């Protein structure tokens, strides 16, 4: 039995289903518990699976869970849950909530690595406390301001106005909505409203932030644009610039620590974070520790998008079902402020329900938009509806089903058409404009249909067309790059994209990056952290970015990384035109597959 379990775990490692690191953790804890034996054999299995679960995006491993079991491990290998629980708690290295132990097993039989359990507990506690707090406001003054900021456009509740009213009443506000639903437009008006309603002698200290430099730049741009349409006399003392969360918190190079923490909190009254679906558990825990208890927090995001690359689906857990579940008391307050409000929930609402709102009306994609229709169809999970949209003949949507050699020939044409302007740009500014107009997105990194294969193909195509000069295959003018590792001293972060271009002042080739304020900043190539070519990037890396035109390439075979959320995120990166290259069966499999990440956060946030 002992040899069987270990040999099966070894085989799972060899097949790439679990990491060698996962098995080593299991073996280490088995040794700490006293070595081999039936009980410790069950510990070896549990610890290895808990660690492997984290590498697959889960926060914990439910003991009853066998659907996501590596194929090399037969379900019969899993002990009966109640017996397994007893043996784990008797091992000496597994504790319960409140204990300090390498592994934590909660009452629902969810097994956590200690640090992730601590993060989940902290996040749940901090958010529940903020959601429970009540803000006082003058309803007469507030209603007049809300009417100025959100003039009536029709019958029924204006959810953007309702979100602003919620911001007055609740120190924590979670706004979810698809692309073009006006999240940042609403946020700009919320900032104006809160600043106008503030009774202090000094204006509110407000910060804008996002997980990546690109997302921060987009937030900056959106808030500036929204300010232009504010009513006269409003919009004073608005923040000038968004920044990355790492910069806001003061990341310390070479560590996972931040300058701002519970002992040295941020000096803020209000923090607005965009693209919150990209925030992982560790970063959110650090943020909540550094945010003063009295400060307001507004999170903007799209619950249907991909979750963070790291463990958890934090923003989706915050949003719950997405449907309004407001209390009678809150609805009465909203009615007083706006004159209208949806009906209160018939079911008892959880602690976070009164702090969440879903914006539904899209303004970017009109009724005749194929991109918007396809995103909605994918989100519904209906393969039939997806196919109906794809073959309706929308002008902003193109579908290509070619495979094999035909696919490569077609891709060569698309690469030349899409990147000609960037590769042939006369100036750095023109090159950046062209780079931000078109992007090729892949679902995977490896293989001929992954970013590695497509970037190699793109460089070959452009070189043969005479658009890349010189023999150097890495350092050449016009090469787009993406940063893969944070470099805090250079203010470069994982996912930042740049362009290699000669500096007009010294004619030296440098890597240029767009800062959140719009400036182009040069970096000497020898100082760059880990990076790669970025004609094509993964959908994960493109999250938080938008492009006028996107070519979305799915692999020719089914892959476990394909999911409805991945597809939806890729589709909604396109603003004006989407070209989808996908095998029919692979596309259908992606639409049917829903990402499920195990954690206890949603239960802790939404259970009464």
Set out the residue ranges of the language-model regions:
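Residue-level signature of catalytic and energy-coupling elements of molecular machines
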Residues: 66, 123, 212, 244, ...
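C-terminal accessory regions
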Residues: 380, 496-608
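Accessory, non-ATPase domains that flank or precede helicase/AAA+ motor cores in DNA-metabolism machines
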Residues: 1-144, 150
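Structural motif
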Residues: 174, 270-272, 298, 441, ...
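ASCE P-loop NTPase helicase motor core
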Residues: 162-164, 168-389
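Conserved helicase motor core of P-loop NTPases
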Residues: 304-481, 487-490
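Pre-Walker A adenine-sensing motif
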Residues: 154-168, 427
């Amino acid at each position: 039995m002992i040899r069987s379990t270990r040999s099966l775990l070894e085989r799972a490692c060899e097949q790439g289903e679990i990491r060698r690191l996962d098995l080593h953790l299991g073996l280490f804890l088995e040794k700490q518990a006293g070595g081999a034996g039936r009980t410790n054999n069950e510990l070896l299995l549990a610890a290895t699976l808990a660690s492997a679960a984290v590498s697959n995006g889960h926060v914990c491993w439910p003991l009853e869970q066998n659907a996501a079991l590596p194929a090399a491990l037969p379900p019969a290998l899993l002990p009966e849950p109640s017996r397994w629980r007893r043996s784990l708690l008797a091992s000496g290295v597994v504790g319960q909530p409140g204990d300090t132990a390498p592994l934590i097993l909660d009452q629902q039989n969810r097994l956590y690595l200690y640090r992730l359990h601590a993060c989940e507990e902290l996040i749940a506690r901090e958010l529940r406390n903020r959601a429970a707090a009540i803000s006082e406001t003058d309803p007469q003054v507030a209603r007049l301001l809300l009417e100025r900021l959100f003039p009536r456009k029709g019958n029924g509740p204006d959810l953007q106005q309702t979100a602003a009213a919620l911001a007055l009443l609740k120190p924590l506000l979670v706004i979810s909505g698809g692309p073009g639903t006006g999240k940042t437009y609403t946020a700009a008006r919320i900032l104006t409203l809160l600043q106008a309603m503030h009774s202090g002698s000094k204006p509110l200290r407000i910060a804008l932030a996002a997980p990546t430099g690109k997302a921060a730049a987009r937030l900056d741009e959106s808030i500036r644009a929204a300010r232009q349409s504010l009513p006269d006399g409003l919009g004073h003392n608005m923040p000038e610039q968004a920044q990355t969360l790492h910069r806001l918190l003061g990341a310390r190079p070479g560590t996972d620590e931040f300058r701002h923490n519970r002992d040295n909190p941020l000096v803020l009254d209000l923090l607005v974070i965009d693209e919150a679906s990209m925030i992982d558990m560790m970063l959110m825990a650090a943020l909540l520790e550094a945010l003063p208890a009295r400060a307001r927090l507004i999170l903007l995001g799209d619950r249907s998008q991909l979750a963070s690359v790291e463990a958890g689906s934090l923003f989706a857990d915050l949003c719950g079902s997405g449907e309004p579940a407001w209390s009678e008391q809150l609805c009465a307050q909203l009615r007083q402020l706006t004159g209208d409000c949806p009906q209160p929930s018939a079911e008892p609402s959880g602690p976070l329900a009164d702090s969440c709102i879903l914006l539904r009306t899209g303004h970017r994609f009109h009724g005749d938009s194929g991109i918007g229709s396809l995103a909605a169809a994918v989100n519904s999970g209906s393969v039939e509806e997806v196919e109906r949209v794809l073959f309706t003949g929308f002008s902003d949507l193109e579908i290509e089903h070619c495979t094999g050699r035909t696919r490569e020939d077609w891709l060569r044409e698309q690469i030349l058409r899409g990147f000609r302007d960037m590769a042939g740009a006369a100036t750095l500014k023109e090159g950046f404009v062209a780079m931000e107009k078109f992007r090729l997105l892949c679902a995977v990194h490896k293989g001929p249909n992954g970013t590695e294969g497509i970037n190699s193909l793109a460089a070959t195509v452009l070189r043969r067309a005479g658009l890349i000069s010189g023999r150097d295959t890495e350092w050449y003018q016009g090469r787009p790059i993406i940063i893969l590792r944070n470099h805090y001293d250079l203010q470069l972060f994982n996912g930042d994209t740049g362009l290699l271009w000669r500096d007009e002042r010294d004619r030296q080739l440098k890597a240029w990056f767009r800062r959140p304020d719009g400036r182009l900043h040069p970096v000497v190539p020898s100082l760059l952290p880990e990076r790669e070519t970025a004609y094509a990037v993964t959908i994960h890396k493109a999250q938080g970015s938008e492009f006028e035109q996107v070519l979305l390439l799915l692999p020719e075979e089914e892959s476990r990384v394909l999911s409805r959320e991945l597809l939806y995120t890729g589709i909604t990166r396109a603003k004006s035109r989407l070209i989808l290259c996908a095998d029919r069966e692979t596309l259908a499999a992606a639409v049917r597959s829903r990402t499920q990440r195990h954690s206890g956060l949603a239960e802790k946030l939404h259970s009464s």
